[in-house]
Design a protein with these regions (language model features):
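Extended beta-strand/loop cores of jelly-roll/beta-sandwich
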Residues: 3-5, 11-123, 130-133
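Chymotrypsin/trypsin-fold serine protease catalytic domain
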Residues: 136-137
Length: 137
């Protein structure tokens, strides 16, 4: 049985470009919005709590862009041509895709846009979620 990703995928694809925000056109009516996150240092993890979060340690990150919103089903459909989500709702986050499907999505997204998207690292995700240093947008 294939492993299914049940968490929502935030289009946290990251790539290096200049500017504060960017709109990525997927087709005439569907867009991705990405926001600039100024790099910096922060403490990742914790010395208390869950074992897999230990130990707390300092991380240094370069500037990056990250998706402003979770990837919607309509954005997925615009790139892939189908919807993997069990409960259709085009404005809702896409879910229930396999890791392989997600990697195929990124590959196709890169071809469609001519950019180099990827998933963020754990550190990039946590830093952005905490507001980074000077997150714009």
């Amino acid at each position: 049985m294939r492993e299914v990703l049940t968490f929502f995928v935030l289009i946290s694809f990251v790539f290096d470009i200049a500017g504060q925000t960017e709109i990525i056109e997927l087709n005439d009516s569907i867009q991705l919005e990405i926001v600039f996150v100024k790099g910096g240092s922060f403490i990742l993890g914790s010395d208390e709590g869950k074992k897999d979060a230990r130990p707390a340690h300092e991380i240094n990150l370069n500037d990056f862009y990250i998706g402003k919103y979770e990837l919607t089903q309509e954005q997925w459909i615009a790139v892939m041509g189908y919807n993997p989500s069990e409960i259709p709702c085009v404005k809702c986050p896409v879910n229930d895709m396999s890791w392989e499907q997600l990697m195929e999505f990124i590959e196709k997204l890169n071809k469609v846009t001519g950019k180099s998207f990827r998933l963020p690292t754990e550190a990039e995700w946590e830093y952005a979620a905490q507001g980074g240093k000077q997150t714009k947008g």
